[in-house]
């Protein structure tokens, strides 16, 4: 891939600024954990796996900022760093998974000198980034087998390299199918209100030379009914124990349309996106974002001033609409409760 979503470089976190794509390919450097938290909150970086990596690197930066004479003081301040990162975005479980992993590593190394502990945390954050890239490639390999030769694949939002450490989940499946020689093409929903499909997915696929057609969100049913879409592949921000899946707002609508038109609807996500502590999707917290994201487009008003707005960032697709969940460990379908639990069994 010709871009890097996020990396640790010279004791700084470097991210591509996704708010400025596709017009400008700009990389931003962050030297402190609070600025990383703000980048996550402001969607400079987004996508569940990517913000998990960003959170881990933010914690590592925070550990380097802490001034402490005792372990008690260090770990007290570390807890505050982790709390700041955890409050950035509530829906994507990878964020919390990464923070908990960093806290666990810190706790396991309490006997080390503080300078060594800081280096251990940096190494762990980089390891999380590297692992995510490998997970995505494995997801791609498993999912590519589900994509028919010559298929037109519909995807929603951006679950590509920009949403992960690289390669992508849903787009990882598409990339792997393309690399395997299947002559596929992609329909990308524009994905209002942030236009991740138009700005990010279309940009990624065009860079890779994968044929892509942009459609507005309300066109999906039209093309499904005409038989122009063979299957749908989306990513996920949190998957409950029964397979209910939170993903970008509008995913549920696409899944219902796919079911009505007998089109397979696949979810691609690493096992780090599973939250088996939640029985079903009703328990998944849904982030609501600022009304301006709906009323303005690139700073220009597109709605009357003072209009009431609702802006949930995610919705939950019930498991009954999902044909299969593609993970780095394999594909699960049917009995999600048993299948998903089997993926993470010790």
Swiss-Prot record:
InterPro entries recorded: IF-2B-related, IF-M1Pi, IF_2B-like_C, Initiation_fac_2B_a/b/d, M1Pi_N, NagB/RpiA_transferase-like
Ligand binding (substrate): 46-48, 89, 196, 247-248
UniProt keyword Cytoplasm, yes or no: no
GO molecular function, one term: S-methyl-5-thioribose-1-phosphate isomerase activity
Swiss-Prot/TrEMBL keywords: Amino-acid biosynthesis, Isomerase, Methionine biosynthesis
EC number per UniProt: 5.3.1.23
Enzyme class, UniProt record, top EC level: isomerase
Lineage: superkingdom: Bacteria
NCBIfam families: eIF-2B_rel, PRK05720.1, salvage_mtnA
Record-given protein name: Methylthioribose-1-phosphate isomerase
Name of the encoding gene: mtnA
